[in-house]
Amino acid sequence: MDKFCNSTFWDLSLLESPEADLPLCFEQTVLVWIPLGFLWLLAPWQLYSVYRSRTKRSSITKFYLAKQVFVVFLLILAAIDLSLALTEDTGQATVPPVRYTNPILYLCTWLLVLAVQHSRQWCVRKNSWFLSLFWILSVLCGVFQFQTLIRALLKDSKSNMAYSYLFFVSYGFQIVLLILTAFSGPSDSTQTPSVTASFLSSITFSWYDRTVLKGYKHPLTLEDVWDIDEGFKTRSVTSKFEAAMTKDLQKARQAFQRRLQKSQRKPEATLHGLNKKQSQSQDVLVLEEAKKKSEKTTKDYPKSWLIKSLFKTFHVVILKSFILKLIHDLLVFLNPQLLKLLIGFVKSSNSYVWFGYICAILMFAVTLIQSFCLQSYFQHCFVLGMCVRTTVMSSIYKKALTLSNLARKQYTIGETVNLMSVDSQKLMDATNYMQLVWSSVIQITLSIFFLWRELGPSILAGVGVMVLLIPVNGVLATKIRNIQVQNMKNKDKRLKIMNEILSGIKILKYFAWEPSFQEQVQGIRKKELKNLLRFGQLQSLLIFILQITPILVSVVTFSVYVLVDSANVLNAEKAFTSITLFNILRFPLSMLPMVTSSILQASVSVDRLERYLGGDDLDTSAIRRVSNFDKAVKFSEASFTWDPDLEATIQDVNLDIKPGQLVAVVGTVGSGKSSLVSAMLGEMENVHGHITIQGSTAYVPQQSWIQNGTIKDNILFGSEYNEKKYQQVLKACALLPDLEILPGGDMAEIGEKGINLSGGQKQRVSLARAAYQDADIYILDDPLSAVDAHVGKHIFNKVVGPNGLLAGKTRIFVTHGIHFLPQVDEIVVLGKGTILEKGSYRDLLDKKGVFARNWKTFMKHSGPEGEATVNNDSEAEDDDDGLIPTMEEIPEDAASLAMRRENSLRRTLSRSSRSSSRRGKSLKNSLKIKNVNVLKEKEKEVEGQKLIKKEFVETGKVKFSIYLKYLQAVGWWSILFIILFYGLNNVAFIGSNLWLSAWTSDSDNLNGTNNSSSHRDMRIGVFGALGLAQGICLLISTLWSIYACRNASKALHGQLLTNILRAPMRFFDTTPTGRIVNRFSGDISTVDDLLPQTLRSWMMCFFGIAGTLVMICMATPVFAIIIIPLSILYISVQVFYVATSRQLRRLDSVTKSPIYSHFSETVTGLPIIRAFEHQQRFLAWNEKQIDINQKCVFSWITSNRWLAIRLELVGNLVVFCSALLLVIYRKTLTGDVVGFVLSNALNITQTLNWLVRMTSEAETNIVAVERISEYINVENEAPWVTDKRPPADWPRHGEIQFNNYQVRYRPELDLVLKGITCNIKSGEKVGVVGRTGAGKSSLTNCLFRILESAGGQIIIDGIDVASIGLHDLRERLTIIPQDPILFSGSLRMNLDPFNKYSDEEVWRALELAHLRSFVSGLQLGLLSEVTEGGDNLSIGQRQLLCLGRAVLRKSKILVLDEATAAVDLETDSLIQTTIRKEFSQCTVITIAHRLHTIMDSDKIMVLDNGKIVEYGSPEELLSNRGSFYLMAKEAGIENVNHTEL
């Protein structure tokens, strides 16, 4: 090599001088070829990847041209350099080969750089990471040659001037290109800048500066947040996961089947003695209960596949993060060696000063590279965690769309939402830190290795301590996992009950049952908090053990080292190098509790997710969809069941339905009509046979499913808007009159579950949704059950019937309305799941079979209201068109009113009655005028019309009052106690460092000899005592903080629950359930787990930094001056960051709520979504919502990295400044001081970073307290109990007086009751009628004070209801509501949640409610389990249970709020009979839905526009020939004087 350069290649003597330098030959060869070799090694891979991508070429930019121009300049300079070498090589002057070689290498390299830069422009507008590294390497390696040439020019100005100047210019261009690569070219305004960011911008996260600046200037909104990269979007990551999951789950299922086959070889026990052939209707409750117990004992399901699938999906990111963490971990161990060199440098008077500066610079460089690697690693890990959460959430949603009904019944909506919210988050948290497991092993192993080098075999004593503690940690970890499993179950139970409470809150308020359900929730919460305390205690013990481990190891190791051999002296180099290594050891050991806890929690979640995602899908193989077939629907020996353990519900059905036919399906209650529909939709388990369907299907369920959105959106249901078709559907479904009344018309927002629509309106919207779809087959499951007879007739004629909108389509029409049957093509009569008869209407009557007998019975008992037909209008007029008792309608809607009035006018005119004609014309004109006024009022914007308000998002800093609220919940004395012991922990830490420094100085003072064994023992004893004091103080402070924070969680949850239950009904009408549930799930979970952990970490970091800075300033007082600018930089970064991070966390919380609400809505409407085959549309909407949330999460993750890299730079500067000052002042310092300062300074980088992280985490997590406080501060309804309490037997008589009573729903809205004045005497039966918006339901709500008075009084038995407590009022009244809502729990709990009544009284109530035989037939009787929403009972049985509640309470005042609107004739008759018998001496107020049910009332109240327009006996009102007369006339009963039915 010497000949190659014509100079010395390497000479160590050059370094042994105050002005050290490297040989020029070394600089011109090795330091030139290193960067060039790096480029040539990686460039081919780059060019090949571009060639493979074949991406569309990007446009040429000025930025790209500038880089290419500078490279061309370098190319020219290389050519000039080669030319100079050739020119100089003349005569006797010999130019060394290196002068030819380097220019040629540079020429080739610059051409390669041009090609690579061009390829990057072709691929994407992003600087190549390895080009950036090449320029950095080139500039760094060039520094040495640069300074050598400068020195040479200063010594001899004429030596190699041309070459030197060419090098300087070339070096300058390389610096310019390095600077250019630090910037990115222009990017798309909507695309995240991370895609096009340069390498330097990527590793420093400078591309995020704009967002941070924007967040500091004003609170961020969703529009300010960048969209995430396509590769991170839900569809992209989920598609990769599904490809892996399909294979892994298949293998897991095969293994599961093998396990199942083995277990089935054993004798099978029957399920609680149940016979498979027991009646399904009688024993469904027993089966539910037995299956739940069975599920608890079995844990068999496809296992151990989810982690494999996730690894296959994200293995590239995992590998990248692995490499980055490995580099970081290896670099960590360079700092102790550099520290050792610096201590030796200070102690040695012969060391050259440049050596100290080199050590300081290297220490800074190493820590800087560590920071870049660590933060890039964390970015990869956290983004990986985000993608894992995205994948899991999307997969859960997709699974919900395909899950079989049997599998779905194992999960309540609350439990499934928990999988999406809690379990996916646990998996994300574990993914963030999972690589710390192997990293900890490497760090611990390398720490022990280097400690062995310092202290020899003595370290084995320390290792022994660690090994002894491993089993203890294992036992604690197992116990923690078991507690976590139990706590997740408790959370599921609590959220399940909360979902039910929120769904049935109106019932709870009517019956004053809030305390009972509050007690249930608090009971589960008590168990949860007990487990949380145990979890915290074990975690504290684990933290104590892992924190004290390095202290014990250091004490034991140092003690053994000095005790085994008197020659072993603990000097500064050994002690502080070892302490630095112990500090490195401390990090993995301190992180292991969190990582272990996170992984254990995640393992529980993985089990739960594997069970759900591995569940059976809906088996649609029995439903064969064909395109060319002569039948629309064909049942071939089809048998279906809801549960394989039960006999078939639909048995051996053979049925052919031709295209275009209208087929009616009839039968008694429980005959299998709805099951037949479900079988066609593929919702049941196939036993044998199959169903063939030709074409698409549309479905209208018996219980309407309405989405939270506008009426228009619900009708269109994702289809394209067609004005003509849309108007036809609205008219046919009788929705136009309703749209005229509703604010906003068809753009009126429907609340959750259609809360602001009547039952009839919801059903007609549901029918309109189906009618708008251009389907081939329409499956209508009793769609007219919730509308009155005249609207039903209109809908049948205009939509379903032979001349309706759907004429020509295949219609399968399940109905109780026998009067429609003459119009259908074929009638199918079902009984016990089989077809009893089928044929045309006339054929079945002629057969004189089951159908003919039922028809005869119907005609005998139907009365005047049963004679209506639907053949044509004229026949209807002649026959006195009336209400049919079998119709289950709700006539309080505008369509009903409009049609009644129109029909009334038509009939009156046809009979030529002048007086009636005049009234009819006047009525018609008044109706027209009213409609005009309504349309005018629609144009006015009325504040408060919007029902569901957008979720409020706080902006700016979290108010100090929120912190105070949480600290107050924690307890001020507890806070002082915790701070005291954290402070004492840090004092003990400082003391142990100072003591160790004094100990190491003994070796210098005693010239390597030990003073005495007692002195040595004293040093060991005090050092050990200080270490033990650290551990004890930490344990006490941690335990106390866990106890105090648990009390805070208990208080906040208690306040939230109490206030939510006391919130007025209007709060629940305007707030989606998902939004409230989010407070009880995500926010409470944060307060339980994350916030206490964050506060503990913050205090440890704060005291740690304070102690470290104090120690550094004690050693080098000059450092106090440097602290000032570093503190300013530190605080500035924190201020910028916290403003952004805080708002991003809020946006994250707010954007989660729609995901959970939409999911709950989807699960509820699954049969409809599947029937319409809209799974993909719903899946796309879910993916869109998740992506909106994910962009907030990604931005928050990046903000943490942006902060961390800048804070670590501050920490690195602290290390560098400390090392620099120690080099400068080395003559006044000793080795122990240097070791003392630097060992603590090296520790400060992570601690500074962690402090701001914890500061931000504290503020972002305190947002959970802010959100909880928002609902804690929601305005309450009136007190439940006041000092003024009514007599125990009140109301004794049941007399009710309304005195000029007025009410409005919200302060900004108009009055809905306008001066109601009437007197209802004791024992009177009053029927209330009126149109939608007349005020009937409002009257009921006022009686129970669901709505509070805006003026006037309601007096019951002489007591103003406003003067007593709500529960004193509501407990003395009884209501049977329209919607029969039940809660999960026992039948007895649903009847008597407070256990006020004896079993005999409960059984008597069941007997009077006609349910005794049913309940006594159940194995568990009153203790039989009711599932969520009462889904395992029929609607009729649910309504009879509600009747049982009323009978059990038997108040003097009973309100029937359309109690029989949604039940069949049989149930209606049972309810009416019991009420007339049991409540004969009570005051009964009935809101009418069928006129025949109130014709025997003592008085009739007719409401219109919030006023009483008529009030009197039925005879009196009929003789007045007013509005009630017209309604009765329409029903064909105006001549009935006092009908007893």
Curated annotation (Swiss-Prot):
Tissue: Mainly expressed in the liver.
Residues bearing glycans: 6, 1007, 1010-1011
Chain coiled-coil ranges: none
Residues the record lists as binding ATP 2: 1330-1337
Presence of the UniProt keyword Manganese in the record: no
Cytoplasmic-side segments: 48-67, 114-125, 186-309, 378-433, 479-540, 605-967, 1051-1093, 1137-1207, 1252-1541
Comp. bias intervals (Low complexity): 906-915
Subcellular location: Apical cell membrane
Enzyme class name: translocase
SMART domains the UniProt entry points to: AAA (SM00382)
A biological-process GO annotation: cellular response to tumor necrosis factor
UniProt-listed Gene3D superfamilies: ABC transporter type 1, transmembrane domain, P-loop containing nucleotide triphosphate hydrolases
Domain ABC transmembrane type-1: 318-601, 975-1260
Function: ATP-dependent transporter of the ATP-binding cassette (ABC) family that binds and hydrolyzes ATP to enable active transport of various substrates including many drugs, toxicants and endogenous compound across cell membranes. Transports a wide variety of conjugated organic anions such as sulfate-, glucuronide- and glutathione (GSH)-conjugates of endo- and xenobiotics substrates. Mediates hepatobiliary excretion of mono- and bis-glucuronidated bilirubin molecules and therefore play an important role in bilirubin detoxification.
Family according to the record: Belongs to the ABC transporter superfamily. ABCC family. Conjugate transporter (TC 3.A.1.208) subfamily.
Protein known as: ATP-binding cassette sub-family C member 2
Gene name in the database record: Abcc2
